[in-house]
C-alpha cells in the first residue's frame, strides 16, 4: 500500500497537494501544526478539509514553543502584516525562522511510524516569497539529513516547487477542486477564509494568480501540465 503524509495548513497550497495525493496514494495522512500563529483559524479549516478530502488520519501537533523562539508578524500581533514589501535583507517579516525545518522533521517522524514512503509539502520557489526554507535546495538537503538520521528512505515531495500561483490554481482545477480551494481554504495572514482580507501579501499573491488563471485558462493549464507531467 502506498502511503503519504501531507504537511497540511488548510491553505491553498497544501489543500491542492492533498487533493492530488488522494489520487496518487492509497492512504494519505495529514499533519497540522499549532505554533500560536496569528491565523489560528487555519487549524479548524484544516480539520474540516482533511475530513472532506478523505484523509486517513489527521493529527494536530502542538509546537507552541516555536512561538516563543521565532519573532515574526505571524507569531506576534504587535508586528503588522505587510502587503508586499520584504525587509531590507529580502526576507519578509512573515518569515518564521525554523518553521519548515521543524515541520518537515516532525512529519518525517510521523511518516516513519505509519510506514509512509513520502512527505508532501506545498512549498514553492517559483513565486518566491523570500522564505529561505521554501527553496528546493533546502528541502533536498533536509530530506537527505532526515533519511541519514533515521536510516530510512522517506521521500520529500514538493509538487508545487516549480509552478507559479496561477498554475497552482490550474492544478486544483485539474483535480476538480477549484471551487473548494477558492471558498474553503485559508491562506490569508489575517485569518480570513476564502478570498481573505484582500490586502496582505498572501491574499495579493493568491488573487493575482487566480485572476491570471481565470483569464488564461487553457494556456495556464497547458503550462501546468507540461511542468508537472500530468496529462
Swiss-Prot record:
EC number(s): the record gives 6.3.4.20
Recorded superkingdom: Bacteria
Q: Which reaction does it catalyse?
A: 7-carboxy-7-deazaguanine + NH4(+) + ATP = 7-cyano-7-deazaguanine + ADP + phosphate + H2O + H(+)
What cofactor requirement does the entry state? Zn(2+)
* Keywords associated with the record: ATP-binding, Ligase, Metal-binding, Nucleotide-binding, Queuosine biosynthesis, Zinc
* Keyword Nucleotide-binding in annotation: yes
Q: Which processes are annotated in GO (biological process)?
A: queuosine biosynthetic process
The signal peptide annotation in the UniProt record is none
Give the pathway annotation. Answer: Purine metabolism; 7-cyano-7-deazaguanine biosynthesis
Question: How is the co-factor bound, per the entry?
Answer: Binds 1 zinc ion per subunit.
Q: Does the keyword Coiled coil apply?
A: no
* Residues that hold Zn(2+) according to the record: 188, 197, 200, 203
Q: Name one GO molecular function term.
A: ATP binding
Residue numbers binding ATP: 8-18
Tell me, what does this protein do in biology? Answer: Catalyzes the ATP-dependent conversion of 7-carboxy-7-deazaguanine (CDG) to 7-cyano-7-deazaguanine (preQ(0)).
Q: Which family does it belong to?
A: Belongs to the QueC family.
Q: Which PANTHER family match?
A: 7-CYANO-7-DEAZAGUANINE SYNTHASE (PTHR42914:SF1)
Name of the protein this chain belongs to: 7-cyano-7-deazaguanine synthase
The gene name on file is: queC
Amino acid at each position: 500500500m502506498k502511503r503519504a503524509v501531507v504537511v497540511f495548513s488548510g491553505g491553498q497550497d497544501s489543500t491542492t497537494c492533498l487533493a492530488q495525493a488522494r489520487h496518487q496514494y492509497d492512504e494519505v495522512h495529514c499533519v497540522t501544526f499549532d505554533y500560536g500563529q496569528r491565523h489560528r483559524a487555519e487549524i479548524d479549516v484544516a480539520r474540516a478539509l482533511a475530513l472532506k478530502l478523505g484523509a486517513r488520519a489527521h493529527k494536530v501537533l502542538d509546537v507552541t514553543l516555536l512561538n516563543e523562539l521565532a519573532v515574526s508578524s505571524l507569531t506576534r500581533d504587535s508586528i503588522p502584516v505587510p502587503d508586499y514589501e520584504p525587509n531590507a535583507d529580502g526576507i519578509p517579516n512573515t518569515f518564521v525562522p525554523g518553521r519548515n525545518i521543524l515541520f518537515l522533521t516532525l512529519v518525517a517522524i510521523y511518516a516513519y511510524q505509519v510506514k509512509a514512503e513520502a512527505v508532501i509539502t506545498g512549498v514553492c520557489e517559483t513565486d518566491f516569497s523570500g522564505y529561505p526554507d521554501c527553496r528546493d535546495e533546502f528541502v533536498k538537503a533536509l530530506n537527505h539529513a532526515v533519511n541519514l538520521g533515521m536510516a530510512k528512505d522517506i521521500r520529500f515531495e514538493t509538487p508545487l516547487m516549480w509552478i507559479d500561483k496561477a498554475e497552482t490554481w490550474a492544478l486544483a482545477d485539474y483535480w476538480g477542486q477549484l471551487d473548494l480551494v477558492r471558498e474553503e481554504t485559508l491562506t490569508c495572514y489575517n485569518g480570513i477564509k476564502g478570498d481573505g482580507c484582500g490586502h496582505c501579501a498572501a491574499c495579493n499573491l493568491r488573487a493575482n494568480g487566480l485572476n491570471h488563471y481565470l483569464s488564461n485558462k487553457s494556456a495556464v493549464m497547458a503550462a501546468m501540465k507540461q511542468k508537472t507531467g500530468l496529462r
